[in-house]
């Protein structure tokens, strides 16, 4: 009986040891996605917004060519990875059922070195995300709706 309990605890601890790094890695990828692409309450959404937000989020060394910020409720973005607000789009990609307000910042000028100058494009778009364990970890594209 004691040996059975010891074996159970050993197997449990090994399983926990294998699961925690995976969960931590997924959580890192999700947090990285949010840091690069989520801004729930933007101010301005113009060229100045792009330049300051890209700089503040450390996306300017070297200057990133293009980056899209998704605005709105984080729960609705997460829901793309399930049936509540998403449909399959191929592989591990999902397309949102509803459009999101987005700002796309595109590098203006040719140099990848700071100071980075960006042009902002605002719009409402359906977005395509890559999901892992029910969370978005990659913004694949955004699709303009007429």
Swiss-Prot record:
TRNA binds at residues 45, 105, 127. Its EC number is 3.1.27.-. It is found in: Secreted; Nucleus; Nucleus, Nucleolus; Cytoplasm, Stress granule. The keyword Disulfide bond applies. GO terms for cellular component: angiogenin-PRI complex; basement membrane; cytoplasm; cytoplasmic stress granule; endocytic vesicle; extracellular space; nucleolus; nucleus. Has weak tRNA ribonuclease activity by itself due to partial autoinhibition by its C-terminus, which folds into a short alpha-helix that partially occludes the substrate-binding site. In absence of stress, the ribonuclease activity is inhibited by RNH1 in the cytoplasm. In response to stress, dissociates from RNH1 in the cytoplasm and associates with cytoplasmic ribosomes with vacant A-sites: ribosomes directly activate the tRNA ribonuclease activity of ANG by refolding the C-terminal alpha-helix. In response to stress, the angiogenic activity of ANG is inhibited by RNH1 in the nucleus. The modification Pyrrolidone carboxylic acid is found at residue 25. One of its GO terms (molecular function) is copper ion binding. GO terms for biological process: actin filament polymerization; angiogenesis; antibacterial humoral response; antimicrobial humoral immune response mediated by antimicrobial peptide; defense response to Gram-positive bacterium; hematopoietic stem cell proliferation; innate immune response; negative regulation of apoptotic process. InterPro entries: RNaseA (IPR001427), RNaseA-like_dom_sf (IPR036816), RNaseA_AS (IPR023411), RNaseA_domain (IPR023412). Keywords: Angiogenesis, Cytoplasm, Developmental protein, Differentiation, Disulfide bond, DNA-binding, Endonuclease, Hydrolase, Nuclease, Nucleus, Protein synthesis inhibitor, Pyrrolidone carboxylic acid, Secreted, Signal, Stress response. A motif (Nucleolar localization signal) lies at residues 55-59. Belongs to the pancreatic ribonuclease family. This is Angiogenin.
